[in-house]
Amino acid sequence: MTRVNSIIGFRPIPVTLLTVITYVSLFSALLFIDRQPPAVAKKGELDYWGVDIEEAWSDLEVLTRDFHPYNSRPNDDVRAYLLGRVQEILSRNGVSGFGNELQSSGYSGTVDLFDDGIPGKPGSNVTFVGAGSEDLTVYFEGTNIIVYIHGERPADELSPVLVSAHYDSVSTGYGATDDGAAVVSILQIIKSFTRPESQGGKRPKRGLVALLNNGEEDFLNGARAFAMHPVAKLPHSFLNLEGAGAGGRATLFRSTDAEVTKYYKRAKRPFGTIVSGDGFKAGLIRSGTDYSVFVENLGMRGLDVAFYQPRSRYHTTEDDARHSSKRSLWHMLGGSLATLRGMTDDTSKVFDSPNGSAGKGHNAVWFDLFGRAFSVLHLHTIFAFTITLIVVPFVVVLVAMWALGHFDKLYFFSNTAYIPPPPEHSIASRTTQGWRGVLRFPVAFVAASAGVVGMAFLINKINPMVVYASQYTVWTCFLSTWWIIAWVILRGADAVRPTALARGYGFLEQWLLWLVAMIGVAISIGKSHLGSGYWVLVFYSGFFTSAFISLLEMAALQKKSEVKIAVSGDDQAYPPEEHSQTGASGNISNRAANDDDDAGEHATEETPLFRGPNRPLSFAPHRNPRYDNGDHDSGDILVEEKDEAVYGGEQGWSKDLPSWTWILQFLATVPLQLVLAGSVALLLGNALAQTGADGSDMLTVLLGFGVFSIILLLPVAPFLHRITYHVTLFIFVIFVGTFIYNLAAPPFSPNARLKVYFQQTVDLQTGENNVHLVGHPDYIDRIVSKHIPSAKGKVDICQADKLKSGLRRCSWKGIAPRVVPQAPGGMPPEYGFSDWISYNVTKTGDGKATIKLRGRNTRACKLLFNKPLAKSPTLGNPIPGFPNTRELRLWSRDWERGWSVELTWEKEEDQEENKDSHSSAIVVCLWSDGNKVSDEIPALHEIRRYLPVWAIASKLADGLVEGSVPFMI
């Protein structure tokens, strides 16, 4: 039995080994999955899908040669390249099609290509109200590329599926991940779905609409323009491919419902959790994707799959092919192929309701396991499980405790005196000591958690941005803090006052803790329809199971009233007749009352610091009067004789407890919990660690790290007192290193550079130009004053930025831009500012005017009004019913064509005040091409050249340069 206990019993070596192996192996696996995308499929699998990863990578390299925002010449080059590639793919596969009019749902061909914006043909123009701003109106002319691959069944019978990506980049990023990888993936998807049968092709049951839209980065404009195209009325489901990071794995960002999410299960390497979707739903993630347009404007149901890390490279020059990989590309492409094949081969009517709409699905909860398995559940099912698990286990525990109490076997919360008691001169325990250990986990939990929270406040005070480049050292510091404090308390208490109930109390009390969390989960589901607490159910169920096992263990024990205590000293167990029942009763009650806390007499200088069974109460050589009846020497003191199955100084009755059940409890509470919580922790860590550059409160981020550090170690708490000191000593060394590092290390590095945001504004009337650099308030002043030559001693003001909350803006008179070509002669650019914008205002009536405006070398301008418009501006496809416009943004598919806009204000006599005031406005045009900054935007070139190596520039707004002219109406 001793040998068996040493192998599988609840002993230090088995517990330590299993704990260390489990945590190290699972953490290593989770980190590997998080950092390393899966390998590219072998040739056989690529041939099965009919795709070529080398060809896709070659396309990506072409697309990312230049910055290509909508308002740039390279954007036209990218569009021409993509159009040519689509035609090449269709021609190679023996199909062709080209049209701009959708006649019916029954086509004679198999593929139609729509060049939306071809010269001489009407394109998709759209006017809409800016999201979240009622006084903003946007007019946009689309230049999308649409490929409609027809299915076996017509669109009016089975709606086609939409797959979408945007081919524009931001003005400061090459767009390899945002959204080049998605664009080249769609090229390969078109290739796969149009293969002839001789090459392994298979015509889908439903059609597939492949959309390459232009203008997503500026306000989701491309998707809104697509909504005006006739093809947009056909699909009811979609897969949107995005990029909000720079490489890594593509995660399922969000989903409309469970029915459409199930298709993502077909992906060979699924990745994602509902936590990201709930982040959008709760408004915690403010950035948007085309997903919003497809759902809110077109009523579709679908998926949003996106790259999401590292955020420090997002919208910067490091979003290039060099910082991405073929592994990342294949992860998106492979998952998309499997998902779309499932969606297009589905012949059910789940997305085709009788009224012609996409119907409505059920809220979903989803998560992956090790990037290989994927679970999709209905939210209402999770809610039902939650309510059931709150009620049923609570009743089960109460019944089990009642039954154990009824049979006199409930050792928890007991201090039952042994009858007959040990002799007067024995130091053996006189009660079951069932209360011992009841407060250990609560005290350890509170103290260790307080230590982690305190550490978060300390780091936030001294070096809050260290998590930006070193999130793993922050994780390690928080984890080691909690472990050390909890271990010292739990192991120390076990050494001083050992008890066989410590593990059981730990499970029972954690189960109650997770019960409170379950109530919170139920409320979040019921009120807000948020399913991010799915992992709490696993924690709760595991700890209920383990707590119930601890209760079942007591069924193997003797009745408390039948426990006999043997003592040794003269190798004789005391006979019952030595103590009459009457004689014992007077002492039993007193001794029992004091047995658990050993506080029978007042402390003296000889009272020991620690007391416990089998320990003398003093280091002094004389007899203790408490156990001395005058007839015995100190050497005659009797101690409790315990079975070899009893560990250390634990209660003698624990010899009958099963020694192996801790393994079941460990398996119920540790592995799956670590996998689920660890996946969520890494997702949140990657998503939040670098948001400080966007103005996020770093204390909130650090506390989030702290909370999940606590959660990750809670499963091991009931076992901590059995883990040897060697582990904690090693962790302490790690803690010291990470603690010093987190307080002293530079927060940024060449691999995780702090983003600062650039824009230059020019008053074309006065010739005054200002450079604006926005960044983190702790660093932006230093960057501008110490590193930018043109700003040294010339910074006019640094103050809180109005556009980016939490950040600080520094402005100074910079080097004049040359974004508009000038006549030769070497004149300073300031002399040509007046030619950048031309406009003409004609008053057509009281409160009415027509303005014609045009910007040189641009196709993006805007009008800012001092008074809100009374009616919608008339231009393109106006949407009636949204007056009060104070800002009108204008986008044209043609260069320097300009716009003619009819405007209507309230009549002067209808205004209650400022009757004598005139309406005024400002014409602003944008220049967004950052490819020749040394010549055209030297201020940005200077910033890129002189920024410290740990900082990198990104765009502040749609235009890198804004030129403005005010006028009166």
Curated annotation (Swiss-Prot):
<feature type="site" description="Transition state stabilizer">
    <location>
        <position position="314"/>
    </location>
</feature>
<feature type="transmembrane region" description="Helical; Name=4">
    <location>
        <begin position="470"/>
        <end position="490"/>
    </location>
</feature>
<feature type="compositionally biased region" description="Polar residues">
    <location>
        <begin position="581"/>
        <end position="592"/>
    </location>
</feature>
<feature type="glycosylation site" description="N-linked (GlcNAc...) asparagine">
    <location>
        <position position="355"/>
    </location>
</feature>
<feature type="topological domain" description="Cytoplasmic">
    <location>
        <begin position="491"/>
        <end position="505"/>
    </location>
</feature>
<feature type="binding site">
    <location>
        <position position="242"/>
    </location>
    <ligand>
        <name>Zn(2+) 1</name>
    </ligand>
</feature>
<keyword id="KW-0378">Hydrolase</keyword>
<dbReference type="Pfam" id="PF22251">
    <property type="entry name" value="PFF1_TM"/>
</dbReference>
<comment type="similarity">
    <text>Belongs to the peptidase M28 family.</text>
</comment>
<dbReference type="Pfam" id="PF04389">
    <property type="entry name" value="Peptidase_M28"/>
</dbReference>
<keyword id="KW-0479">Metal-binding</keyword>
<dbReference type="Pfam" id="PF22250">
    <property type="entry name" value="PFF1_C"/>
</dbReference>
<feature type="binding site">
    <location>
        <position position="178"/>
    </location>
    <ligand>
        <name>Zn(2+) 1</name>
    </ligand>
</feature>
<feature type="binding site">
    <location>
        <position position="315"/>
    </location>
    <ligand>
        <name>Zn(2+) 2</name>
    </ligand>
</feature>
<feature type="transmembrane region" description="Helical; Name=9">
    <location>
        <begin position="728"/>
        <end position="748"/>
    </location>
</feature>
<feature type="glycosylation site" description="N-linked (GlcNAc...) asparagine">
    <location>
        <position position="125"/>
    </location>
</feature>
<keyword id="KW-0645">Protease</keyword>
<feature type="transmembrane region" description="Helical; Name=3">
    <location>
        <begin position="439"/>
        <end position="459"/>
    </location>
</feature>
<feature type="active site" description="Proton acceptor">
    <location>
        <position position="216"/>
    </location>
</feature>
<feature type="region of interest" description="Disordered">
    <location>
        <begin position="571"/>
        <end position="629"/>
    </location>
</feature>
<feature type="topological domain" description="Vacuolar">
    <location>
        <begin position="684"/>
        <end position="698"/>
    </location>
</feature>
<feature type="transmembrane region" description="Helical; Name=6">
    <location>
        <begin position="532"/>
        <end position="552"/>
    </location>
</feature>
<feature type="topological domain" description="Cytoplasmic">
    <location>
        <begin position="403"/>
        <end position="438"/>
    </location>
</feature>
<dbReference type="InterPro" id="IPR053976">
    <property type="entry name" value="PFF1_TM"/>
</dbReference>
<dbReference type="InterPro" id="IPR048024">
    <property type="entry name" value="Fxna-like_M28_dom"/>
</dbReference>
<dbReference type="GO" id="GO:0008235">
    <property type="term" value="F:metalloexopeptidase activity"/>
</dbReference>
<keyword id="KW-1133">Transmembrane helix</keyword>
<feature type="topological domain" description="Vacuolar">
    <location>
        <begin position="34"/>
        <end position="381"/>
    </location>
</feature>
<feature type="topological domain" description="Cytoplasmic">
    <location>
        <begin position="553"/>
        <end position="662"/>
    </location>
</feature>
<protein>
    <recommendedName>
        <fullName>Vacuolar membrane protease</fullName>
        <ecNumber>3.4.-.-</ecNumber>
    </recommendedName>
</protein>
<keyword id="KW-0812">Transmembrane</keyword>
<dbReference type="InterPro" id="IPR045175">
    <property type="entry name" value="M28_fam"/>
</dbReference>
<feature type="topological domain" description="Vacuolar">
    <location>
        <begin position="749"/>
        <end position="969"/>
    </location>
</feature>
<feature type="glycosylation site" description="N-linked (GlcNAc...) asparagine">
    <location>
        <position position="840"/>
    </location>
</feature>
<dbReference type="GO" id="GO:0006508">
    <property type="term" value="P:proteolysis"/>
</dbReference>
<keyword id="KW-0926">Vacuole</keyword>
<keyword id="KW-0482">Metalloprotease</keyword>
<feature type="topological domain" description="Cytoplasmic">
    <location>
        <begin position="720"/>
        <end position="727"/>
    </location>
</feature>
<feature type="topological domain" description="Cytoplasmic">
    <location>
        <begin position="1"/>
        <end position="12"/>
    </location>
</feature>
<feature type="binding site">
    <location>
        <position position="178"/>
    </location>
    <ligand>
        <name>Zn(2+) 2</name>
    </ligand>
</feature>
<feature type="binding site">
    <location>
        <position position="166"/>
    </location>
    <ligand>
        <name>Zn(2+) 1</name>
    </ligand>
</feature>
<dbReference type="GO" id="GO:0005774">
    <property type="term" value="C:vacuolar membrane"/>
</dbReference>
